[in-house]
């Protein structure tokens, strides 16, 4: 669920996800096209691809269970579909954390009209 994903990102990065990631680069937030602008944008590209592989439910609005154990995200024993979505969100939140040093404020509200490179496939 998007609210759970928001909490994961906040916990991993310390950043407010809606401000910092909802409109970042070419892939963070709704949709995506072109080539990811940097490592943070690539986190969103990979997250989009991960969601595309999950079929049979709506990854944005289905709830899953997870916990934080010693600072690590642990996805719960949900049915396959929701567990996989949790893993997608977990990987993205960790990716954001791992790429904090290269986060660029200039991509924070990047207009997608500048995402003109050929779109990569998953």
UniProtKB/Swiss-Prot annotation:
GO CC field: extracellular region
Location relative to the cell: Secreted
Tissue expression: Expressed by the venom gland.
EC number, UniProt record: 3.1.1.4
PROSITE patterns xrefs: PA2_HIS (PS00118)
Known cofactor(s): Ca(2+)
Family: Belongs to the phospholipase A2 family. Group II subfamily. D49 sub-subfamily.
Function summary: PLA2 catalyzes the calcium-dependent hydrolysis of the 2-acyl groups in 3-sn-phosphoglycerides.
Designated name of the protein: Basic phospholipase A2 PL-X
Organism the protein comes from: Protobothrops flavoviridis
